[in-house]
Amino acid sequence: MEQISFHQENFRRRTRYTAVFLILAVVFCVVTVLNINTGNVHIPVPKILRILFLKEGAATEYNIIWKIRLPRILMAALLGGALSLSGFLLQTFFSNPIAGPFVLGISSGAKMVVALTMIVYLKYIGRFSSYTLILAAFIGSLISTGFILLMSKKVQHMASLLVGGIMIGYICSAITDFVVTFADDSDIVNLHGWSQGSFSGMSWSNIRVAAVVVGLAVLLTFFLSKPISAYQLGEAYAQSMGVNIKTFRVILILLSSILSACVTAFAGPISFVGIAVPFLARKAFGTSKPIVVIPGTFFMGAVFCMICDLIARMALAPVELNISTVTSILGAPIVIYMMIPKGGRK
């Protein structure tokens, strides 16, 4: 009888996982079509399908889809998934659902070093590559993360650590503003546009670079599913299962920093996605199993950022909102809900 009950429960879980992934896949397809369909130039769905699959159509519409809208959509999906997974790794590391690259100042650290790099390169060299920005953002992420790790050894309460992370973010932002004060006007325009956060202006070369970096990080994260699962049950249990805690924690931070750095390098700082989406994924799938939550978080983050980008483009068209404006409006209430005690818990 117990065996039958176990099989029934297992079947229900698998059905739920499959249903959620199917819903996400459908929403992904619908939002993709809407993103291509809407804009200053409206393109009917039949034309979209012909251009995408048969590569037939007017030159103007063809270029709008293949050179502007499709790269933007794919980049929003790729970076949205990366940022969500970065948040999941930080939440695993700190064992706290409020931990995220934006809240802990990691995105601000990446922004600071990228800003310095952009100003120096534009002033003395004239141009920079995508790899240069990713490396700069990664270094900035590690700087902020290093300070947070030092604080974590001295601070006992997670709330104090989170406040410390926010302060680090403010310090990095202040340094960025100070540097911008002495930059040329043309450099300030480039930096200001990037620092507001946006998926616009993406190219296929950007996608190729981001896909390699994010793809490798996601693959490594997925291979860590079993150690993460053990770590979620406590360090003592993880050690008993053969997990080298120090090495494992370093890998978590490095992967999270790489993912966050890639997002910041291409799209600028984006808020609340890294906190809200992992929470939504765990709620939707009804489990904390990494083997389910890791791909679920990435996929849900992709869909979430695609929806946010669509809202940013169309809410006040032809004026485009900053992507962080939309992610904050949608993500902040979710974070507030997370912090409200449930079931009388204080």
Language model features with spans:
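Alpha-helical transmembrane segments in inner-membrane proteins
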Residues: 1-346
